[in-house]
Swiss-Prot record:
Presence of keyword Chaperone: yes
Keywords: Chaperone, Cytoplasm
Native source organism of the sequence: Thermoplasma volcanium (strain ATCC 51530 / DSM 4299 / JCM 9571 / NBRC 15438 / GSS1)
Name of protein: Prefoldin subunit alpha
SUPFAM superfamilies on file: Prefoldin
Length: 130
């Protein structure tokens, strides 16, 4: 196999690995957002008598949660807004849809890269047979 073809195949493999890592990271975000929606939708927090709030570095403090008052929600670039729990849940559901669209685009890119890899590999294999 010629060096340039081998380099091209290695490059495509690295791109596929990069796309796979991005898909994995986004899937983890989707799971985290789904968990947050479940928590916000559940009355379990209201019924819990003990609430520990992380203050960082593995340290927790006893605290109270008032889910009926506004939640402070990040909307990007270090900007936060106050909104009702129901609005936050809807925002999170929209975020999941956006993340799923991103996953689909990445899957399409991955398919294209795999097709390119197979084309380069098959073309080189055909040349070597002749």
């Amino acid at each position: 196999m010629a060096r340039d073809v081998e380099a091209q195949l290695n490059y495509i493999e690295s791109l596929i690995s990069s796309v796979d890592a991005q898909i994995d990271a986004i899937n983890k975000m989707v799971l985290e957002v789904q968990t947050t929606i479940q928590i916000l939708s559940s009355d379990e927090l209201r019924q819990s008598k003990e609430r520990l709030i992380s203050v960082g570095s593995g340290i927790f403090a006893n605290g109270n949660l008032d889910l009926d008052s506004d939640l402070i929600v990040p909307i990007g670039s270090g900007v936060y807004i106050a909104e009702k729990r129901s609005e936050t849940i809807e925002r999170l559901k929209a975020n999941i849809e956006n993340l799923k669209e991103s996953i689909q685009k990445l899957m399409d890119q991955r398919r294209t890269l795999v097709d390119q890899y197979n084309t380069v590999y098959t073309t080189e294999a055909t040349r070597n047979i002749k």
